[in-house]
């Protein structure tokens, strides 16, 4: 998540984008989490928001595609959900869309001896984002972002 999708995640994204969009939803992103029981998590959104029926419709459609294509060699659970208040960020477009909002980042490789950063999204330039952290601008490569989420404020 955040940038630098795995080869499997790229392949899955290519396979399921069209079916998700055909149902009228935006494919926000996907995560494939390997474990004893692996999980394929799909995040969807729409202008009207997402409810349980929307998730069920997408799950049914995506399951049919995955059953035919069979891209995942291990047993897994399929989860479809809205991005929620702490919306995950996957693409440069997501960062641009939420410019001015607060984001929490976990990096693949430390920058200045830190892997965790939190600040305001200031700018997006190609595959680089600028985040203002404690009054100072820090630049991160999307490919170095392991996980990124908006920080909700109540």
UniProtKB/Swiss-Prot annotation:
<dbReference type="InterPro" id="IPR035956">
    <property type="entry name" value="RimP_N_sf"/>
</dbReference>
<comment type="function">
    <text>Required for maturation of 30S ribosomal subunits.</text>
</comment>
<dbReference type="InterPro" id="IPR003728">
    <property type="entry name" value="Ribosome_maturation_RimP"/>
</dbReference>
<dbReference type="Pfam" id="PF02576">
    <property type="entry name" value="RimP_N"/>
</dbReference>
<dbReference type="GO" id="GO:0000028">
    <property type="term" value="P:ribosomal small subunit assembly"/>
</dbReference>
<dbReference type="Pfam" id="PF17384">
    <property type="entry name" value="DUF150_C"/>
</dbReference>
<keyword id="KW-0963">Cytoplasm</keyword>
<dbReference type="InterPro" id="IPR028989">
    <property type="entry name" value="RimP_N"/>
</dbReference>
<keyword id="KW-0690">Ribosome biogenesis</keyword>
<dbReference type="GO" id="GO:0005829">
    <property type="term" value="C:cytosol"/>
</dbReference>
<protein>
    <recommendedName>
        <fullName>Ribosome maturation factor RimP</fullName>
    </recommendedName>
</protein>
<dbReference type="InterPro" id="IPR028998">
    <property type="entry name" value="RimP_C"/>
</dbReference>
<dbReference type="InterPro" id="IPR036847">
    <property type="entry name" value="RimP_C_sf"/>
</dbReference>
<dbReference type="GO" id="GO:0006412">
    <property type="term" value="P:translation"/>
</dbReference>
<comment type="similarity">
    <text>Belongs to the RimP family.</text>
</comment>
């Amino acid at each position: 998540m955040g940038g630098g999708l795995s080869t499997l995640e790229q392949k899955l994204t290519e396979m399921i984008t069209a079916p998700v969009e055909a149902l009228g939803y935006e494919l926000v992103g996907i995560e494939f989490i390997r474990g004893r029981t692996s999980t394929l998590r799909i995040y969807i959104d729409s202008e009207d928001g997402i409810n349980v029926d929307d998730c069920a419709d997408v799950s049914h459609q995506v399951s049919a595609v995955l059953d035919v294509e069979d891209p995942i060699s291990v047993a897994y659970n399929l989860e479809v959900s809205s991005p929620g208040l702490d919306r995950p960020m996957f693409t440069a477009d997501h960062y641009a869309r939420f410019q001015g909002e607060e984001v929490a980042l976990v990096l693949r490789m430390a920058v200045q001896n830190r892997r965790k950063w939190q600040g305001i999204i200031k700018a997006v330039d190609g595959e680089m984002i600028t985040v203002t952290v404690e009054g100072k601008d820090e630049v991160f490569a999307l490919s170095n972002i392991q996980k990124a989420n908006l920080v909700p404020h109540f």
